[in-house]
Amino acid sequence: MDLTSKNYLKWVANKRCIYHGTAETVVPHHIRSLRLGAGMGIKAPDINTIPVCHECHTNCHNGTIDLETQLMWCLQTINNALAEGEIQYG
């Protein structure tokens, strides 16, 4: 998968919130971290995206939901994408 993928972002946006399980107002949240190849002025790769509701999106940005939790959710999202054939390994 390329670093940017509109199809993957659309797929993420159509999922339920990874934490609350709600389907209303789900937005793709890019996990931004210098360790993950993103930071100030640098967009995170789309593979580092998780489906979250507005509340969780706010909490990801304000630090209430820590980076470790976001990364765990990212792995779950990638596993789901692999299982559904949205992305392929290799």
Predicted region positions:
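Processing junctions and N-termini across compartments
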Residues: 11, 47-50
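Short cysteine-rich loop/turn motifs with clustered Cys
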Residues: 2-29, 55
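Generic signature of intrinsically disordered, low-complexity segments enriched in small/polar residues
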Residues: 11-14, 22, 33, 60, ...
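Polybasic, low-complexity binding patches
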Residues: 37-48, 58-90
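Short recognition patches in nucleic-acid-associated and regulatory proteins
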Residues: 24-40
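Short, intrinsically disordered, charge-biased short linear motifs at domain edges
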Residues: 1-9, 37-44
